[in-house]
UniProtKB/Swiss-Prot annotation:
Chain intervals for the UniProt region annotation (Disordered): 131-166
Name of the protein: Protein Mdm4
Lineage: superkingdom: Eukaryota
Residues spanning the membrane: none
GO cellular component, one term: nucleus
Species assigned in the record: Mus musculus
Subcellular location: Nucleus
Protein's GO biological process: atrial septum development; atrioventricular valve morphogenesis; DNA damage response, signal transduction by p53 class mediator; endocardial cushion morphogenesis; heart valve development; negative regulation of intrinsic apoptotic signaling pathway by p53 class mediator; negative regulation of protein catabolic process; negative regulation of transcription by RNA polymerase II
Length: 489
């Protein structure tokens, strides 16, 4: 009988362990919390952690318990949620009262099944330890021999009492083990839900699960003690509450389609609106404040500016302070140094013997100008305009007529440049008036900033959605650093 009881208890404990391993992720809320979940549209009595958090958020939204101005504040006084929390209000930035309530009102379904299995096993042991009705009848027929009955009772009582002591110790160990497993299991469910991504109404980790994670996020983390929670400001992230589900799905699908369609148009839009800057230049600009201004990062490879005497990183070709070009930059390239060091042609001094000689009345040719870099030549073309350099053959006898021709040509070029600038500005203005390139509904008021350039191609909602999803700029495929809203007056 003792061996049968032990085997029954082992089988019951094995089934309890098997049930607990299968149903770890399910929780069962208590009655008061279950009423709140049912009021928010939940069905059933067993949920996952994500479902519990979802319906709690739906309850807060339906009842409009949050403040319209400061939407991270939830006022639950006089409501079922306030009675359950035991407070009048709480902030989303410090959700510790909410987590304490969930710990008290959530029970893992696995622990319920294991308790049932344990109760069944203890009941079997209890029925086996006490005599049955047949055994009592058999004892009544043998009552005539009291000594024999006493000896049999002693022989049965001794192993049974030992078995009871051993079973009671095993039961205490099992209950203690189950309580520890239940607590760790609930903590694990909270932590797994917390890492998976939070809605707007719950921020931060559990106080007992505050473990620093190096996930590359920009959230500021303080001391990870028991009273500390990871908090990020999402008070302006309620814009999606006013949008329908179909609109959100439509925008998400159009973002993927627009990324594939606009790859062929990147060259056209970038040539019209922005000057193409290399990726290395943007990286240098973003790291300039951290790399160049640190006094402790001195090395033998740094070069000193000849203008302001500042030490700069060896990878920089311009001085960070005065923006002067580094001396002997790429000195091995003869063409580049020649173009940068080319000076104006110095006039040949006339001999004193030639003074007083009349200039002949004839035509003469002027030598070809020295080839200069394209940018520098265009900049010096207007302020240093010389009639002798712009005309191939000059009639020295008719200088007044040539000057009139040159002045008329200058006026025509100025008029042409002004017309070209006006047409470009009109094209840019018409592009701004077009709707968003992703949703094609809202105006283009979301300015996508990356480095020292930005693009105004989407609305503010779509631009912020791209920033949150980690997508790149739809115009130039660069990483989005900041999104601002533009108001066109």
């Amino acid at each position: 009988m003792t061996s049968h009881s032990t085997s029954a208890q082992c089988s019951a404990s094995d089934s309890a362990c098997r049930i607990s391993s299968e149903q770890i992720s399910q929780v069962r809320p208590k009655l008061q919390l279950l009423k709140i979940l049912h009021a928010a549209g939940a069905q059933g009595e067993v949920f996952t952690m994500k479902e519990v958090m979802h319906y709690l958020g739906q309850y807060i939204m339906v009842k409009q318990l949050y403040d319209q101005q400061e939407q991270h504040m939830v006022y639950c006084g006089g409501d079922l949620l306030g009675d359950l929390l035991g407070c009048q209000s709480f902030s989303v930035k410090d959700p510790s009262p909410l987590y304490d309530m969930l710990r008290k009102n959530l029970v893992t379904s696995a622990s319920i099944n294991t308790d049932a299995a344990q109760t069944l096993a203890l009941a079997q042991d209890h029925t086996m330890d006490f005599p049955s009705q047949d055994r009592l009848k058999h004892g009544a027929t043998e009552y005539s021999n009291p000594r024999k009955r006493t000896e049999e009772e002693d022989t049965h009582t001794l192993p049974t009492s030992r078995h009871k002591c051993r079973d009671s110790r095993a039961d205490e160990d099992l209950i203690e083990h189950l309580s520890q497993d239940e607590t760790s299991r609930l903590d694990l469910d909270f932590e797994e839900w917390d890492v998976a991504g939070l809605p707007w109404w719950f921020l931060g980790n559990l106080r007992n699960n505050c473990i620093p994670k190096s996930n590359g996020s920009t959230d500021l983390q303080t001391n990870q003690d028991i009273g500390t929670a990871i908090v990020s400001d999402t008070t302006d992230d309620l814009w999606f509450l006013n949008e329908t589900v179909s609109e959100q799905l439509g925008v998400g699908i159009k973002v993927e389609a627009a990324n594939s369609e606009q790859t062929s148009e990147v060259g056209k839009t970038s040539n019209k609106k922005t000057v193409e800057v290399g990726k290395d230049d943007d990286l240098e600009d973003s790291r300039s404040l951290s790399d160049d201004t640190d006094v402790e990062l001195t090395s033998e490879d740094e070069w000193q500016c000849t203008e302001c005497k500042k030490f700069n990183s060896p990878s920089k070709r311009y001085c960070f302070r005065c923006w002067a070009l580094r001396k002997d930059w790429y000195s091995d390239c003869s063409k580049l140094t020649h173009s940068l060091s080319t000076s104006n042609i110095t006039a040949i001094p006339e001999k004193k013997d030639n003074e007083g000689i009349d200039v002949p009345d004839c035509r003469r040719t002027i030598s070809a100008p020295v080839v200069r870099p394209k940018d520098g030549y265009l900049k010096e073309e207007k302020p240093r305009f010389d009639p002798c350099n712009s005309v191939g053959f000059l009639d020295l006898a008719h200088s007044s007529e040539s000057q009139e021709i040159i002045s008329s040509a200058r006026e025509q070029t100025d008029i042409f440049s002004e017309q070209k600038a006006e047409t470009e500005s009109m094209e840019d203005f018409q592009n701004v008036l077009k709707p968003c390139s992703l949703c094609e509904k809202r105006p283009r008021d979301g300015n996508i900033i990356h480095g020292k350039t930005s693009h105004l191609t989407t609305c503010f909602h779509c631009a912020r959605r791209l920033k949150k999803s980690g997508a790149s700029c739809p115009a130039c495929k660069k990483e989005i650093q900041l999104v601002i809203k533009v108001f066109i007056a």
